[in-house]
Structure formats: C-alpha cells, structure tokens
C-alpha cells in the first residue's frame, strides 16, 4: 500500500470545518471515554475530508469479556469492530468515497499517537488500514488540540502531518 496509489495516507489533508466540529462534538459527548470513527472524502480529491461516520468504542465490551487480554477500558483505549471496519473500507472504495482517516479522542491526555496506537495500526512496517489518523485531545471536558498522524513506511512509527481546516 503506497502513498502514490492512496495519497491521503501521506497526510497534508484538508478537512471541512463542519466535519472537524462533528469529530470534536463526538469527543466531548463521549468523554470520559474515547470516541472513534471514520472520515471519508472523494477519491478524485485525495486531500479532501468531507464526511464522517461515528463508530462505537467497543473497548469496555472487550475488557469485560477478557480483562487479561484487554486490560484497558474506554477511558484510555478505543476498539472499533474489525469486521465493520473492513466492510466500511470496502464500501467506501466501491462508492468512490474512501475512508481516508480513522479518528479517535484521548481523555485528559495530549493528541499524540500512543505506543498502543502504533502497535494497533502498524505491524512489521506495514500500515494495517489504508488511511491517516486524527487524534483529538479532550482535557477536563474541553477540546484542547487535534493532530493528524501518518505512517512512516517501513517502520511501525507515525509522524505528525498538516491538517488544514476548510472554512465554508
């Protein structure tokens, strides 16, 4: 999977203000749990993010079922249903409106890409899902910051990239 065939995975994206506002609202509504979801855009405008789909954070469900394997709760971890994610990516590609970003929030922590995030979304230098990542920080019930993260090819690391808010 390369940035040439899927340019949004390389970053430098532009998000419509209404979409960023909705991501932030989702983060505030979910607090003190992490929120998560997908952001889409037209395939023929690779940098544009113009729609989102909220997803349920299933971290607490997994933690209740198997706290040894899933020791973290939704306050510090998010888990999207993998089958639903695969179907969403496939449908987006088929519709010409691919998933370009997975977003999630951090509660009372910065908008960094955590070691857990890196381990979840990259393995042996390969990106697990063909997208970039937005992390929104909610501190004491208020949005503090937001950052876009992209995979460093050939590593399990991620770097910050430019995310521009597109005013109406």
Describe the residue ranges of each PLM region:
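Residue-level "edge-of-site" marker
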Residues: 105
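Conserved beta-strand-loop surface patch within small alpha/beta domains used
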Residues: 1-99, 108-168
């Amino acid at each position: 999977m390369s940035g040439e065939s899927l340019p949004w995975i390389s970053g430098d994206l532009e998000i419509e203000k209404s979409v960023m506002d909705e991501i932030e609202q989702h983060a505030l509504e979910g607090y003190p749990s992490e929120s998560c979801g997908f952001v889409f855009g037209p395939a023929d405008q690779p940098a544009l993010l113009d729609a989102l789909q909220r997803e349920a954070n299933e971290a607490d469900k997994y933690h209740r079922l198997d706290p040894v394997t899933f020791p973290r709760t939704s306050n510090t971890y998010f888990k999207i249903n993998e089958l639903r994610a695969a179907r969403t990516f496939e449908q987006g590609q088929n519709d010409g409106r691919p998933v370009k970003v997975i977003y999630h929030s951090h509660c009372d922590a910065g908008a960094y890409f955590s070691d857990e995030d890196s381990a979840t979304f990259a393995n042996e230098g390969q990106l697990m899902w063909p997208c970039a990542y937005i992390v929104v920080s909610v501190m004491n019930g208020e949005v503090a910051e937001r950052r876009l993260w992209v995979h460093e090819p050939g590593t399990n690391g991620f770097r910050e990239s430019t995310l521009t808010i597109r005013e109406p």
